[in-house]
Amino acid sequence: MSLARPTSIIPADQNRNLLGELRVRHPSWYYWTFAYTVLTVICLAAGLIDERNFQGVSVWDKPFKFALSIAVYFATLGWFANLMQPDYFNTLRGKLLTGVPVVCALLEMLYILVQGARGEPSHFNVSSPFYSVMYGLMGAGAALMVATCLWMGCSILRNRGTNDIWVLSVGIGLIGTFVLGGGVGFYLGGAEAHWVSGETTDAGGLPLVNWSRTGGDLRVAHFFGIHAMQVIPCVGALLVWLRQRNRIGHLGAQVCLTSVSLGFAAFCISTFIQALRGAPFI
């Protein structure tokens, strides 16, 4: 296996920064990353100005978190885009792969923004036929977004094989997001709330994430699951770095990546079981 610098991880043009490289790899997802980053800042500012609360936290807390999460989502997909087949995104399938998550994220974000601005819940809100339909559509959109990860992960592994550590880590991470994040998300969609026992408020939760400290919280497992697409490739990038410096062999890197991936999956499942038992994460 060549120890040459892997251009799939770093910019191919050393005169180009990371944002410039992302723009080259997938322009559409780059611009949506930028748009949701701006929206994240706007929601953060709105939360500082607007003193209204819902379930113990700012009404802008959920829009802020979702805008940030979607920005990271598109940045990640865009960074992996160069592992797809050449000109794949110019085909009908490629255009669908680009457009489906964009439309789903946009519609979901708009609804979350509107509900947040009104001080009304977007998730678990089935108080009227309209809200029930909207909640169902949000779930369908989220399912399509994680299905995009599955589609892309399988395509990358089929196109590039599993011998390259970086490629393998990307494939595992994307598929892991579908399995772990999507699996917990599916369960969440059928639940009445993200709390299991404990106080039904986000007030007093863990800093930044607001996870319950008085009972179980299903958002914990969902959070870690959907971020498999970042965690596992980061491990892969570290292993590539070690390979370049002859500090680990190819077989050792594969074993390490497999072990970490299985361990991460076990961790996500354990946090899910922990929440179901009504126990707080910390």
Model-derived features: positions:
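Cytoplasmic juxtamembrane interface segments
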Residues: A4-I9, A71-P86, W151-L168, A191-T200
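Membrane-interfacial catalytic/cofactor-binding modules of polytopic membrane enzymes
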Residues: L188-A228
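Helix-boundary and loop/linker segments of multi-pass membrane transporters
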Residues: E21-L22, S127, L208-S212
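Membrane-interface helix-loop-helix junctions at boundaries between adjacent transmembrane segments
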Residues: F89-C104, V114-A142, T148-V170
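Hydrophobic cores of alpha-helical transmembrane segments in multi-pass integral membrane proteins
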Residues: S28-L48, D61-L83, G99-G116, L137-M152, ...
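Short, Lys/Arg-rich, polar N-terminal cytosolic tail immediately upstream
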Residues: M1-R25
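Interfacial helix-loop-helix junctions of multi-pass membrane proteins
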Residues: L48-F54, S58, A117-S127, W195-V196, ...
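Cytoplasmic juxtamembrane regions at transmembrane-helix boundaries
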Residues: N90-L97, G161-F178, V240-F264
